[in-house]
């Protein structure tokens, strides 16, 4: 295979992040300097983000049999890079109070971002598996980064063991699919899986095992049990990455698989996915009702959000609007989650033991940090899907595609789930405006809005509001990503 200059340009984000990994690794070996390594990481991620413009000039192409670079890949690469940038930005002040090695944090985030970019470009079950492992392995270390806390170490061990088990299910499922179809390429699967072949027991078993593995990575019921514990035990900046980059890009590659391979044509698979979506929406919202820890609450909330997205995935065969719905919803989910976890990160920085993740820590926040409380309120309203926020646009799209595909009971679940979600999101928002306790707990620095993390949080809030009122620019970007697939 000949590598042309066009191929290299198409792979620029992957190459730049890979080069940044090597540079940061050498920098750590040469001299430990927290500011230097954080700066190198942020510069590398920004350069990769800018390089997407050059990738767009090249056009869609299959760079290798394992990777396809097109508008769809660029959209999800951009979302992963934004989430990685935000994670590094939130981590810097948190690590300032951390007494152990700080620099490896950025190295692990960069490697996870590399896995995310590979997943966004995946066009083959082999690259899908490699990407998932490359994004998962660094997270084992990141989740347990505050290893002197029992909660963080426990979360890391739990996530590592369960993730390894899920990966084995995924790999075994791929082996069964290969045994029946004779190919692992998404396009070849679409050609080889002809009429009636999807009802073959071996193929159904293979896709069933893959659903188990991918369901774990996406925190779908009943593979969700790790989610609240890991979100609570992981440092706040790591929870940011877990909630955004890893979920978004894995869902994106599943969308590509469903688009090329006629997996959704199987009635059995559609029914299983519909049951999982229904259970995720209802269970995720019901479990979030009783939470007093904001990271656990957001963990259960993420289960329900992935359930909403599954509705659009099931409706994929009925029209292109499903692709648009997923893109808009994921963008709204990204900015809302970055803002919410960003506030938790600011409240928890610098590192002083456990994060400020108790709901009690946010009681009366408005009276001494009014702008921060307003940002958190906007994020809660967006996650709840209230009009005038980007979250509402995404949820409206999901309901529209559900109605278009006649998935009435799933549309009902989305409506009921949203109503339940409204209660616990408003409970968080209302607590921000109650009287502050006599003995306040953790607090964000007085100049938080001038820090890099504060700026990211404010920009996220601004985007959620502006795109909630005028979503056309985002919709145009998402539509541009579709014809190139």
UniProtKB/Swiss-Prot annotation:
It is a multi-pass membrane protein. PANTHER family: NADH DEHYDROGENASE. Pfam families: Proton_antipo_M (PF00361). GO terms for biological process: ATP synthesis coupled electron transport. It is an enzyme of class 7 (translocase). Keywords: Cell inner membrane, Cell membrane, Membrane, NAD, Quinone, Translocase, Transmembrane, Transmembrane helix, Transport, Ubiquinone. Belongs to the complex I subunit 2 family. Signal peptide: none annotated. Its EC number is 7.1.1.-. InterPro entries: NADH-Q_OxRdtase_suN/2, ND/Mrp_TM. This is NADH-quinone oxidoreductase subunit N. GO terms for molecular function: NADH dehydrogenase (ubiquinone) activity; NADH:ubiquinone reductase (non-electrogenic) activity; quinone binding. It comes from Shigella dysenteriae serotype 1 (strain Sd197). The keyword Zinc-finger does not apply. It catalyses: a quinone + NADH + 5 H(+)(in) = a quinol + NAD(+) + 4 H(+)(out). The chain crosses the membrane at residues 8-28, 35-55, 71-91, 105-125, 127-147, 159-179, 203-223, 235-255, 271-291, 297-317, 326-346, 373-393, 408-430, 455-475. NDH-1 is composed of 13 different subunits. Subunits NuoA, H, J, K, L, M, N constitute the membrane sector of the complex.
């Amino acid at each position: 295979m000949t590598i042309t200059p066009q191929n290299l340009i198409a792979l620029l984000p992957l190459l730049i992040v890979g080069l940044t990994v090597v540079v940061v690794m050498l920098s750590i070996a040469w001299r430990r300097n927290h500011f230097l390594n954080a700066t190198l990481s942020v510069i590398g991620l920004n350069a990769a983000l800018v390089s997407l413009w050059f990738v767009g000039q090249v056009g869609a192409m299959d760079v290798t049999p394992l990777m396809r670079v097109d508008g769809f890949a660029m959209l999800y690469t951009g979302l992963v890079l934004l989430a990685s940038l935000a994670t590094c930005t939130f981590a810097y002040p948190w690590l300032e109070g951390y007494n152990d090695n700080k620099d490896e944090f950025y190295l692990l985030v960069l490697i996870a971002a590399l896995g995310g970019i590979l997943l966004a470009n995946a066009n083959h079950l082999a690259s899908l598996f490699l990407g998932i492992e490359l994004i998962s392995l660094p997270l084992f270390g990141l989740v347990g980064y505050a290893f002197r806390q029992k909660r963080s170490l426990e979360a890391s061990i739990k996530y590592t063991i369960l993730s390894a088990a899920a990966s084995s299910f995924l790999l075994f499922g791929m082996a069964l699919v290969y045994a029946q179809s004779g190919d692992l390429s998404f396009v070849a699967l679409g050609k080889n899986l002809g009429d009636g072949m999807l009802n073959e027991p071996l193929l159904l078993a293979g896709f069933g095992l893959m659903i188990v593995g991918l369901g774990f990575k996406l925190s779908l019921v009943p593979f969700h049990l790790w989610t609240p514990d890991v979100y609570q035990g992981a440092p706040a900046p790591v929870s940011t990455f877990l909630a955004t980059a890893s979920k978004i890009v894995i869902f994106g590659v599943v969308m590509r698989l469903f688009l090329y391979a006629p997996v959704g044509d199987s009635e059995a698979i559609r029914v299983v996915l519909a049951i999982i979506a229904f259970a995720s929406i209802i269970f995720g919202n019901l479990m979030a009702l009783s939470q007093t820890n904001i990271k656990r609450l957001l963990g259960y909330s993420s289960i329900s959000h992935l359930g909403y997205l599954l509705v659009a995935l099931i409706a994929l065969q009925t029209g292109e609007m499903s692709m648009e719905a997923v893109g808009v919803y994921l963008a709204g989910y990204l900015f809302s989650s970055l803002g919410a976890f960003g506030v938790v990160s600011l409240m928890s920085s610098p590192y002083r033991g456990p994060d400020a993740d108790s709901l009690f820590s946010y009681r009366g926040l408005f009276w001494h940090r009014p702008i921060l409380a307003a940002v958190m309120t906007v994020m809660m309203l967006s996650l709840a899907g209230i009009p005038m926020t980007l979250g509402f646009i995404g949820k409206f799209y999901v309901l529209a595609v559900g109605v278009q595909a006649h998935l009435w009971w799933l549309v009902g679940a989305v409506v009921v789930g949203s109503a339940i979600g409204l209660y616990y999101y408003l409970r968080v928002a209302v607590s921000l405006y109650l009287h502050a306790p006599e003995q306040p707990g953790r607090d964000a620095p007085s100049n938080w809005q001038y820090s890099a993390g504060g700026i990211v949080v404010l920009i996220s809030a601004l985007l959620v509001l502006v795109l909630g009122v005028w979503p056309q620019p985002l919709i145009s970007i998402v539509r541009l990503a579709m014809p190139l697939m």
